[in-house]
Regions:
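Conserved N-terminal segment of class I S-adenosyl-L-methionine
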Residues: 1-121, 131-134, 220-228, 232, ...
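Short, glycine-/aromatic-enriched active-site segment of Class I SAM-dependent methyltransferases
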Residues: 25-27, 147-169, 173-181
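Feature marks short, surface-exposed loop/turn motifs that line or immediately flank catalytic pockets
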Residues: 86, 106, 155-157, 196
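A short His-aromatic
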Residues: 122, 126
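A short glycine-rich, Lys/Arg-flanked "PGG" loop and its adjoining helix->strand segment in the class I
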Residues: 131-146
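Conserved S-adenosyl-L-methionine
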Residues: 185-195
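C-terminal helical/coil "lid" or tail adjacent to the Rossmann-like core of SAM-dependent
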Residues: 197-236
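C-terminal beta-strand of the catalytic ATP-binding
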Residues: 261-264
């Protein structure tokens, strides 16, 4: 069952073409990047003391990669997204799903219980007013609850792939911190992730993969194509090897930034 908290009609395509969410789900769910982000997030939750069966809302759950990982770990997880089509694809008996637009007023159910943690993984870069979105995330958690946000990093890497996803920006630490400034949340720390990918993206920036007549999902799929085996194994190993360094805050740069905050 899908609950609806948002008021009015949300324009999901203004954030990312819904066809990308629907048509490429199977590809994304087995892609090393999304799987590695889910593993890092689960490890981070554990280090924050947020263990199963804590209640967690995954805002912008999209293809459901992290949502499924949370469920398998035993969390009481709720998936939230602006896209009704994406939610329909994830819907099955026993799963908690919510239609939620962080850019618009919303009204949780009368019996709403704040969550122990809220995730917004690669969400706020799609939103013009990212600070307002972060403040709304704070409304979802109980006092003492955690908010984890991840964003694409390094503005000089902004490229066609960002554009077709509806990204407004890539972040530096100071711009990510600014999004939390008046949110009512206390920003505890931030850290880089994906350091090993920076040289790869710098080497290919400025190149385009769109072909004449391409739909957004066709171009997106082209970006998701991996080199032949054993490249996928190497990618998984690279993410695994740097995970502890990322969580320790010892990476000096990365293609993503994570922020960890709590509600006082």
């Amino acid at each position: 069952m899908i609950a609806r908290w948002s008021r009015g009609e949300a324009d999901a395509d203004s954030n990312m073409a819904e066809a990308i969410l629907v048509d490429l789900a199977a590809t994304v769910r087995r892609h090393p990047w999304w799987l590695a982000r889910s593993r890092l997030t689960l490890e981070l939750l554990g280090r924050l003391g947020v263990h199963s069966p804590s209640r967690i809302i995954d805002v912008g759950c999209g293809w459901g990669t992290t949502l499924e990982a949370l469920e398998l770990r035993g969390y009481a997880a709720t998936g939230a997204d602006i896209s009704r089509q994406a939610l329909n694809q994830l819907d099955h008996p026993g799963r908690s799903l919510v239609e939620l637009d962080l850019t618009a007023p919303w009204s949780p159910l009368d019996d709403f219980q704040p969550f122990d943690a809220a995730l917004a993984l690669d969400v706020i870069e799609h939103i013009d007013d990212d600070a307002a979105a972060v403040a709304r995330l704070g409304r979802l958690v109980r006092p003492g609850g955690s908010v984890i946000v991840s964003v694409p990093a390094l503005p000089d890497l902004f490229n066609e792939f960002d554009q077709i996803q509806g990204h407004r920006r890539r972040y530096l630490p100071e711009t990510l911190q600014a999004a939390f400034q008046d949110s009512g949340l206390i920003l505890d720390r931030w850290f880089w992730w994906g350091s090993w990918m920076v040289p790869l993206l710098r080497r290919t920036r400025g190149r385009t993969r769109a072909l004449p007549g391409d739909t957004p999902e066709a171009t997106y799929a082209r970006y998701l194509q991996l080199p032949p085996w054993p490249a996928p194994l190497i990618f998984r190993a690279a993410f695994a090897l740097e995970q502890d360094r990322a969580l320790a805050g010892s990476l000096k740069r990365g293609t993503s930034l994570f922020a960890v905050a709590h509600k006082p």
